[in-house]
Amino acid sequence: MPAPSVVEAILRIDRAAFGDEWMMDQQTFREALHATQRARIFVSHDDGELTGFVIAGVTDSYGFIQRLAVHPDFQRHGVAGSLVQNSLSWIHSRGCRSTVVNTEVSNDAALSIYEKNGFVPLDYNLLVMERQLSV
């Protein structure tokens, strides 16, 4: 687990990148790190400031890009592509032959990054559903 100051910086970037609807909290962050047999966080910096991160994980044969976020001030500067490339190199070094990622169908920026890094859409229909609960 990274130092608390790094976790806070990662969560700040995540909030800035995703807003309230999809943002991670500390519990979700821990779950992402423990969702696979082994996970690693790659970060990017600019003048000592954390600008983006990716959480990558591996199982026996598959790699996963579990979370990718870049602060809006640093988007469209190659940060996300570099983070994806670093995570793919690490996943490959762990012996995985395939890597999976998911993103919103309407997220053109993410789709472009993943396609530039060799990802292709799979023929899956995934429906996200929600039920409001009274508090």
Regions found by a protein language model. Name each.
Residues M1-I10:
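A short beta-loop-alpha structural element at the N-terminal edge
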Residues R12-M24:
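Helix-loop element at the rim of GNAT/NAT acetyltransferase active sites that forms part
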Residues V58, H71-D73, H77, V105-S106:
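Active-site acidic-Proline motif in GNAT/NAT acetyltransferases
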Residues V70, R76-S89, S93, S112-K116:
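Conserved acetyl-CoA-binding loop-helix of GNAT-fold acetyltransferases
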Residues I91-T103, N125:
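Conserved GNAT acetyl-CoA-binding A-motif
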Residues V101-L111, V128-L133:
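Conserved beta-strand-loop-alpha-helix junction that forms the acyl-donor binding cleft
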